[in-house]
């Protein structure tokens, strides 16, 4: 929790040994719920109140503080399991380490070992600042995506750079950032602070080759999220809101997809992309010339049956024939043109029969 390290190579980042597209974490954190932010911010506020006692308290004060401190840290860590990159952690192992650090058996080391005390206080500081970092970043990135990125016709580095420049220098953006809770603590900044070096790794595309990987160190999660956002846009990746599930996802090419690849909440058997495509096809079908004619002719058939001009059996047969032929139209791009051939003298015409489709 105290710091985070990210390996960067081309348009990929590597965290805990796994590969992700640049911008993955910045897009994912936008899906945190309001209730989760409230929860972790509340725990961060408690850690802030307890920090002075943790730093200057004597044995008796620490014995009283550590149990409630552990409860607060546990609540925060369990809540963070829904937030990337913490969702990728072995959270039970992290909880185990903190349970030991915040136990009464550890008090002697906190009082007698300066390095142990320094690490303990650094963890508390991270717990205080992390919720504010998430809150400030989410508000700023939401503003960026909603008012600047979402309207872009083309999603590439040039368009993202212009959009971010306009966003960052817009007076309304400054007003939004200044009105946030604790605006001077972990503010959204376009110049993330970081430290970097190089390391070596196997080429993901060819294990026989070695590559240089940029290893980036962050002491602030705000800097981590901002860097991932900007690095993603540098490679043409950016967050976008799915119009089906209303969650944010990362786009990685220049066209603007409306839907993500997650499961559609309306139907768990389909992804949002599949569900959206189905709805689009239905809308196209509803406006297709064949289906307008289909609706007109089936209404005519129904009225003829009601007026006694045709039998119920003939009505069913005619409707079935209309449905069969109309169902072939848009899917095969068979457009009905010209007149509508009559069937069986009953006045019920159908469109798109063999003669029409063979033109």
Regions found by a protein language model. Give the residues of each.
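Short helix-coil boundary/hinge micro-motifs
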Residues: 1-250, 281, 285, 289-308, ...
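Cysteine-rich micro-motifs
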Residues: 254-275
């Amino acid at each position: 929790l105290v710091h985070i390290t990210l390996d960067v190579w081309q348009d990929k980042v590597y965290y805990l040994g796994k590969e992700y597209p640049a911008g993955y974490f910045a897009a994912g954190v936008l899906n945190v719920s309001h209730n989760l932010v409230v929860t972790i911010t509340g725990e961060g506020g408690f850690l802030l109140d307890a920090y002075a006692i943790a730093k200057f308290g004597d044995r008796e004060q620490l014995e009283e503080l550590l149990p409630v401190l552990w409860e607060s840290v546990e609540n925060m860590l369990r809540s963070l399991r829904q937030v990337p990159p913490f969702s990728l952690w072995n959270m039970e192992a992290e909880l185990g380490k903190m349970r030991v650090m915040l136990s009464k058996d550890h008090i002697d080391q906190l009082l007698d070992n300066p390095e142990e005390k320094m690490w303990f206080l650094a963890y508390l500081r991270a717990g205080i600042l992390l919720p504010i970092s998430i809150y400030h970043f989410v508000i700023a990135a939401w503003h960026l995506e909603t008012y600047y990125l979402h309207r872009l016709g083309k999603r590439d580095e040039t368009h993202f750079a212009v959009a971010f420049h306009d966003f960052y220098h817009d007076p309304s953006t400054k007003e939004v950032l200044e009105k946030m809770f604790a605006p001077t603590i972990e503010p959204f900044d376009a110049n993330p602070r970081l430290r970097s070096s190089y390391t070596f790794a196997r080429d993901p595309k060819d294990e026989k080759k070695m590559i240089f990987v940029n290893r980036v160190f962050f002491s602030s999660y705000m800097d981590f999220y901002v860097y991932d956002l900007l690095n993603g846009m540098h490679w043409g990746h950016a967050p976008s809101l799915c119009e089906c599930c209303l969650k944010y996802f990362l786009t990685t090419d220049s066209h603007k997809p409306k839907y993500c690849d997650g499961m559609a909440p309306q139907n768990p058997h389909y992804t949002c992309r599949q569900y959206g495509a189905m709805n689009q096809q239905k809308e196209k079908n509803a406006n297709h010339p064949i289906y307008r004619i289909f609706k007109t002719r089936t209404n005519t058939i129904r009225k003829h049956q009601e007026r006694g001009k045709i039998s119920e059996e003939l009505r069913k047969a005619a409707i079935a024939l209309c449905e069969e032929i109309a169902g072939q139209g848009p899917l095969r791009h068979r457009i009905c043109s010209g007149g509508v051939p009559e069937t069986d003298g009953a006045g019920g015409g159908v469109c798109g029969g063999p003669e029409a489709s063979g033109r």
